[in-house]
C-alpha cells in the first residue's frame, strides 16, 4: 500500500499542488502521513465543514487546486457545503475521501456509508481508485487518475474532483521503505491548453526519431496538415482505419503495423524518442502494447478538448489545441529518414504478406475486405462493426488514393446498435456499406425495420462464421467451456429476413458470386444483405499465417 499512495502524493506535487488540508481520521492514515512525509504544506482542520471552507479560501487565493483529505463515513458529508460553494464559485479542489474496502460495505461496518459519487453533480469528476497493489502498473495507474483529477478541477471552468480511495488494514505506511518516485515517467506529465499548447518548444522534435499515431476521428479536418508534419519530422504516420488517412498512398502512412508489431524484436528495434497522438485510442492492441513498452518516451496527445485516452498509461504531455493548428505550429525540419525507413521496410514486407490473401480460393475475411475496397464507389461510407470486422479492416484495408469514409462505433467498442447506426449513416445519400460479423448483426436485427420503413439504401456484407470467432484469438479459446460460453454457435438461417423486412438477400458461395452480388446490390434500392459464410477454423489458420513476418 505504501508506494501506491506515495505515487498518488508525488504525482499531485509534480502537477503543481502544494497544499493539503487534512481532517483527522483512522481510515485516511496513509494519505495523511504521506502528505506530511513528502513535504506538502499541511493544514489540519478538526471540523470537516470548517476544513472544507478553509481549503476553499486557500484555492481562491493561490488560484490552484488544493487537496482535501478525510476519513470514511459522515466525515465525507461534512465537506458538502464547501463543495457546493466551490462548484458555484468555480474554485479548484481535489477531494480525497478514504473508504472501507468492498468487503466491509453494506454489512454494518462502522463509519461506512455509500461514498460513490457522493457529491453528485457538484463534483466535475469522480473516480474510485482500485485497492492498492504494489506493482509498477498500479503506480502508473494511480498517477493517471491524479492527472485526470487535477486537469478536471481546472479545465473548462474550475471546480471539484472527487476521488474515493478504499483502503484495507493495516493502515500505517512504511516510512522506512517509502519510494515516492514509484511509477514516475521519465517526462513529468504536463497539460497545456489553448495558445500555451501552440507555443511549446518544438525543438524537442529536432533530430529525434518519432511516430505520429492517428486514431479514429469522424470529424477530422487536419489530414493535410498532419501529413505535412509527418514529412517535416520524417515520422511514420500510423493510420487507424477510422482515422481515414488511408485515402492516400503517401510512403509515410503505415497501414499494417498491427501485424508486424506482433514481433517483440521489431517492437524493440522501432523504439521512438517521441510520439504524437491525434484522435481516439487506436483499434490495434499491439500498438497500445508498443507504447506501453516504451514508457520513457515523450508522448504527446493533442485534442480539441480534454479527454484522457491513455490505456497504455504512457502519456506525458496533453495539449488541448486544434490538431490542425498544432501541426502547423511545429516548424522543425528533420533530415535523417533512417528511422522512418525501418518502419517502411516492415510495412512493405507485411503488406506483401497480407496481399497473399488474394491467392486464397476459400472465402476469407481478409480477401473479402480487399475485394470490398476494390469495389466501393468514390464517396462511399464503409461502416465497420466491432469485434473481428474492424480488426480485419485494420489488417487488410490498404492505404491508397481513393475517396471513401470509414466509420465505426469505437466509443464504448460494443457490438450493439451496429445495423441502426449504419442506417443512420445511410441517410446521407452516399453509397453506404456495413461490414459486420454475425453476432453484431443478430444483436441489432430489429434495426432493419427503420431501413424498411424509411426506404433507406444500405448494403450489408455479413461475415458469418457462426458465432464469436474472435475468441479463438484470445486465451479463452483454451477453456473447456469455449464452445458454450464464447464461440456460441447459433446455426441461424438469415434467409427469412427477405420476407420479414422486405429486403434483398444473397448467399454468395465464392468470390465470383460475391462480386456479382455486390455490383448488383449497388444498383438496387433498399437494404441488401450479402450473407458470406466463413469457416472459422480455416479463417484462424489464414490469419495466423498471413499476419506473421516469417
Swiss-Prot record:
One of its GO terms (biological process) is menaquinone biosynthetic process. Its EC number is 2.2.1.9. Belongs to the TPP enzyme family. MenD subfamily. Pfam families: TPP_enzyme_C, TPP_enzyme_M_2, TPP_enzyme_N. The lineage of its organism: Bacteria, Bacillati, Bacillota, Clostridia, Eubacteriales. Homodimer. Pathway: Quinol/quinone metabolism; 1,4-dihydroxy-2-naphthoate biosynthesis; 1,4-dihydroxy-2-naphthoate from chorismate: step 2/7; Quinol/quinone metabolism; menaquinone biosynthesis. Its cofactor is Mg(2+); Mn(2+); thiamine diphosphate. Coiled coil: none annotated. Binds 1 thiamine pyrophosphate per subunit. It catalyses: isochorismate + 2-oxoglutarate + H(+) = 5-enolpyruvoyl-6-hydroxy-2-succinyl-cyclohex-3-ene-1-carboxylate + CO2. GO terms for molecular function: 2-succinyl-5-enolpyruvyl-6-hydroxy-3-cyclohexene-1-carboxylic-acid synthase activity; magnesium ion binding; manganese ion binding; thiamine pyrophosphate binding. It comes from the Bacteria. PANTHER family: 2-SUCCINYL-5-ENOLPYRUVYL-6-HYDROXY-3-CYCLOHEXENE-1-CARBOXYLATE SYNTHASE, PROTEIN PHYLLO, CHLOROPLASTIC. Keywords: Magnesium, Manganese, Menaquinone biosynthesis, Metal-binding, Thiamine pyrophosphate, Transferase. It is an enzyme of class 2 (transferase). This is 2-succinyl-5-enolpyruvyl-6-hydroxy-3-cyclohexene-1-carboxylate synthase. Catalyzes the thiamine diphosphate-dependent decarboxylation of 2-oxoglutarate and the subsequent addition of the resulting succinic semialdehyde-thiamine pyrophosphate anion to isochorismate to yield 2-succinyl-5-enolpyruvyl-6-hydroxy-3-cyclohexene-1-carboxylate (SEPHCHC). It comes from Desulfitobacterium hafniense (strain Y51).
Amino acid at each position: 500500500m505504501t508506494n501506491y499512495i506515495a505515487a498518488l502524493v508525488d504525482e499531485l506535487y509534480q502537477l503543481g499542488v502544494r497544499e493539503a488540508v487534512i481532517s483527522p481520521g483512522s481510515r485516511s492514515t496513509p494519505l495523511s502521513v504521506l502528505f506530511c512525509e513528502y513535504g506538502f504544506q499541511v493544514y489540519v482542520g478538526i471540523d470537516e465543514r470548517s476544513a472544507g471552507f478553509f481549503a476553499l479560501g486557500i484555492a481562491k487565493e493561490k488560484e490552484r487546486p488544493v487537496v482535501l483529505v478525510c476519513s470514511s463515513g459522515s466525515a465525507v458529508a461534512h465537506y458538502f457545503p464547501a463543495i457546493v460553494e466551490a462548484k458555484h464559485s468555480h474554485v479548484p479542489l481535489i477531494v480525497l475521501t478514504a473508504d472501507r474496502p468492498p468487503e466491509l460495505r453494506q454489512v454494518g461496518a462502522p463509519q461506512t456509508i455509500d461514498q460513490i459519487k457522493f457529491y453528485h453533480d457538484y463534483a466535475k469528476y469522480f473516480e474510485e481508485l482500485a485497492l492498492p497493489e504494489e506493482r509498477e502498473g498500479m503506480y502508473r495507474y494511480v498517477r493517471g487518475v491524479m492527472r485526470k483529477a487535477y486537469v478536471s478541477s481546472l479545465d473548462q471552468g474550475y471546480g471539484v474532483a472527487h476521488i474515493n480511495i478504499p483502503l484495507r488494514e493495516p493502515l500505517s505506511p512504511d516510512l522506512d521503505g517509502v519510494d515516492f518516485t514509484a511509477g514516475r515517467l521519465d517526462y513529468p506529465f504536463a497539460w497545456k491548453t489553448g495558445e500555451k499548447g501552440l507555443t511549446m518548444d518544438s525543438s524537442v522534435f529536432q533530430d529525434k526519431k518519432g511516430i505520429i499515431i492517428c486514431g479514429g476521428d469522424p470529424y477530422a479536418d487536419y489530414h493535410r496538415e498532419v501529413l505535412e508534419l509527418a514529412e517535416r519530422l520524417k515520422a511514420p504516420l500510423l493510420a487507424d482505419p477510422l482515422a481515414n488517412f488511408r485515402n492516400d498512398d503517401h510512403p509515410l502512412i503505415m497501414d499494417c503495423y498491427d501485424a508486424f508489431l506482433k514481433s517483440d524484436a521489431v517492437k524493440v528495434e522501432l523504439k521512438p524518442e517521441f510520439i504524437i497522438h491525434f484522435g481516439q485510442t487506436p483499434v490495434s492492441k499491439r500498438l497500445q502494447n508498443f507504447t506501453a513498452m516504451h514508457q520513457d518516451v515523450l508522448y504527446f496527445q493533442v485534442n480539441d478538448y480534454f479527454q484522457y485516452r491513455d490505456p497504455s498509461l504512457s502519456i506525458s504531455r496533453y495539449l488541448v489545441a486544434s490538431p490542425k493548428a498544432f501541426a502547423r505550429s511545429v516548424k522543425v525540419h528533420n533530415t535523417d529518414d533512417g528511422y522512418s525507413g525501418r518502419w517502411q521496410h516492415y510495412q512493405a514486407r507485411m503488406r506483401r504478406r497480407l496481399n497473399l490473401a488474394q491467392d486464397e480460393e476459400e472465402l476469407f475475411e481478409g480477401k473479402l475486405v480487399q475485394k470490398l475496397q476494390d469495389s466501393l464507389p468514390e464517396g462511399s461510407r464503409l461502416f465497420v462493426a466491432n469485434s473481428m470486422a474492424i480488426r480485419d479492416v485494420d489488417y487488410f484495408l490498404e492505404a491508397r488514393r481513393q475517396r471513401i469514409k470509414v466509420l465505426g462505433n469505437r466509443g464504448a467498442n460494443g457490438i450493439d446498435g451496429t445495423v441502426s447506426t449504419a442506417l443512420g449513416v445511410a441517410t446521407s445519400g452516399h453509397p453506404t456499406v456495413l461490414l459486420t460479423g454475425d453476432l453484431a448483426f443478430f444483436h441489432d436485427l430489429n434495426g432493419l425495420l427503420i431501413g424498411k420503413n424509411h426506404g433507406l439504401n444500405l448494403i450489408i456484407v455479413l461475415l458469418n462464421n457462426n458465432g464469436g470467432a474472435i475468441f479463438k484469438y484470445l486465451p479463452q479459446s483454451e477453456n473447456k467451456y469455449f464452445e458454450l460460453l464464447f464461440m456460441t454457435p447459433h446455426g441461424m438461417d438469415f434467409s427469412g429476413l427477405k420476407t420479414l423486412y422486405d429486403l434483398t438477400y444473397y448467399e454468395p458461395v465464392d468470390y465470383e458470386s460475391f462480386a456479382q452480388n455486390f455490383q448488383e446490390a449497388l444498383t438496387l434500392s433498399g437494404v441488401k444483405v450479402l450473407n458470406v459464410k466463413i469457416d472459422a477454423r480455416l479463417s484462424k489458420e489464414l490469419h495466423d499465417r498471413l499476419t506473421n513476418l516469417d
